[in-house]
Structures are given as C-alpha cells and as structure tokens.
Amino acid sequence: MGETAIIPLFYHQDIEINKKVIKACYDGGARVFEFTNRGIQAHHLFSELKRWASEEMDDLILGVGSIVDAGTAALFIQEGADFVVSPIVNVEMAKVCNRRKIAWIPGCATLSEINFAEELGAEIVKLFPAAQIGGPDFIKSVLGPNHWSSLMPSGGVLPEQENLEKWFKAGAYCVGLGSKLIIKNKNGDYDYEKIRTLTKDTINFARDIKSQVE
C-alpha cells in the first residue's frame, strides 16, 4: 500500500463494471484495490471478482471495505479478501482478522482510537472521514506523539498534485480514493480510459511527493 501510495475504492452491482474499473486502475499502476461492501449481494460479487483477478492479474491485492462487524469480515475472508477495511474500531473484527493473518485497517477519528486500534494489531489505520476530522493538520498532530503510526486518510482526498502534497507532506502513509478517481463521462458512463490515466498520474504524483518527504 505504501509503494503505490493510493488505494482505489469502488462498488457497483454490475460485475462487468466492477471488472472494467478494477482493470482500468490496474493498467494505471494500482496494485491494491478496495471493493466496498455496499450491496446486499456484495459478497457474491466479490467472490467472482477475486477468482477473475487471480486469473487476470495475479499480483493485484484485492480487499474489502465498509465492513462493520466480525461476521461480515469472516465471510469476505472466506471469499479470499486480502485485507479488510472498516470505518470503525471493532474488537471482534480485529480478532477474526488477526486469527487468519489478514490485514485489518480500522477507521479512527481520534488519537485514542488510533492507539487502541494499534494495540489490537492494526498496522495501518484509516482516518475517516479525513477532511471532517481535521485534514492534513490532524495527521501532523497525531504523528507528533505517534510518529510510528501509518495513517491512511479517506474522504476529502483529491487526485490532484496540490491536494496530495498536503496529505503526504503531513505524513500520510497512503490515501484512499473513490469517486474523485473513478469518474464518469458526460453521458454518465464510467470513463475507463480516463480512470486509467488519472490513476497513473495520481500514483506518479504521490510517489514523487513521498520521495521528497521521506
């Protein structure tokens, strides 16, 4: 996650649209992708996507996001999730992921939550909603006493050099990007070529910025 520095996240009820979006991001250089758990049949879609990705792009790390309970985490792990992202800190979810040695990325909004999540085994912590809880300045404040923390802001991050500079210069480990990266054309259809090029440009921006601050 730190290598490409961005994590695209997406969900659609149409399996083919999911595949095209994932492929566009992959072709743009993304090697980690978060499928968000937003629909009733999301786990069935994920299962098919995982099998497809294993055959078509075997170096893609495909995980699941928007998980809020241990049972759902276990279900997606059984379907092959490489990591689990949550908007909350949940002790039972941490136990499930740790038992299966699956990376668990909980969502936190305070320094106390971040420390608690790390005590539960979280190597990376999601800051959510990042813009609303203080943005880049919040990251700077956290990394003062917690210089070892790996923070992934999500919510309010833009695939633009100026915006990315603020997050990474503040100390972000990586960033989550959704609808601002996975964009549509004027007709309302997903613009897969634009998604590919925007992913490529965003990764290049992020890597350049991180190389300057590390």
Regions found by a protein language model. Give the residues of each.
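Catalytic cores of alpha/beta
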Residues: 69-79, 112-120, 137, 157-175
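Glycine-enriched alpha-helix->loop->beta-strand junction motifs that scaffold or abut catalytic
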Residues: 26-31, 77-84, 98-105, 119-126, ...
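Conserved N-terminal beta1-alpha1 strand-loop-helix module at the mouth
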Residues: 1-71, 75-79, 169, 189-212
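Glycine-rich phosphate-binding active-site loops on the catalytic face of alpha/beta enzymes
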Residues: 84-93, 126-135, 171-191
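Active-site beta-loop-alpha junctions enriched in small/polar residues
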Residues: 9-13, 36-40, 65-69, 89, ...
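Alpha-helical segments flanking ligand/cofactor-binding loops in enzyme cores
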Residues: 19-23, 74, 95, 115-118, ...
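Hydrophobic faces of well-ordered beta-strands that scaffold small-molecule active sites
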Residues: 5-10, 33-35, 60-65, 84-85, ...
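Glycine/Thr-rich beta-alpha phosphate-binding loop at enzyme active sites
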Residues: 31-39, 72, 77-79, 100, ...
